């Protein structure tokens, strides 16, 4: 017990020595107002970055804000814009026109083609592929699969 008392007293004295000056510094900082960190050791470049960030935040045309200029207003009124005013090259314009032509093509990509054979097959129902040119082995596999499916003692049946 005798050794603990001096240590506790030393800790209390050190705490008082460190806490009191820190508290007075905070009070002085609050009295001064806005602090850009010059007292904390910010460099001049860091201060300049902070000022630029403040200026950007107050800019009405800053990031995240929509700009409305004369060109944009006119483009909204016109509708489709092929980019001639923005300086698209001839090849870019040709690509855009080709893409529009493909999109309007009734037999373009993603559209189902219906010919006479498909229409007839849909009317008939099951087709074993003889008209499409299935080989004998493919036809045999299909017939075996049908036979297994109709077997009363086949897989999945008790």
Swiss-Prot record:
GO terms for cellular component: extracellular space. The lineage of its organism: Eukaryota, Metazoa, Ecdysozoa, Arthropoda, Hexapoda. Expressed by the venom secretory cell of the spine. The spine is a cuticular structure containing a single large nucleated venom-secreting cell at its base. It is an independent unit capable of producing, storing and injecting venom. On the back of D.vulnerans caterpillars, spines are grouped together by 50 to 100 to form scoli, of which there are eight in D.vulnerans. The keyword Lyase does not apply. It is found in: Secreted. The keyword Nuclease does not apply. Probable toxin. Does not show insecticidal, antimicrobial and antiparasitic activities. Does not induce increase in intracellular calcium in mouse DRG neurons, suggesting that it does not induce pain. Residues 25-32, 64-78, 110-124 form a propeptide. Transmembrane segments: none annotated. Coiled coil: none annotated. It comes from Doratifera vulnerans (Mottled cup moth). Sequence repeats lie at residues 33-78, 79-124, 125-158. GO terms for molecular function: diuretic hormone activity; G protein-coupled receptor binding; toxin activity. Residues 101-120 are annotated as: Disordered. InterPro entries: DH2-like. This is U-limacoditoxin(8)-Dv66. Residues 33-158 are annotated as: 3 X 46 AA tandem repeats. Keywords: Amidation, Cleavage on pair of basic residues, Repeat, Secreted, Signal, Toxin. It comes from the Eukaryota. GO terms for biological process: body fluid secretion. Is also classified in the limacoditoxin-8 (DH31) family.
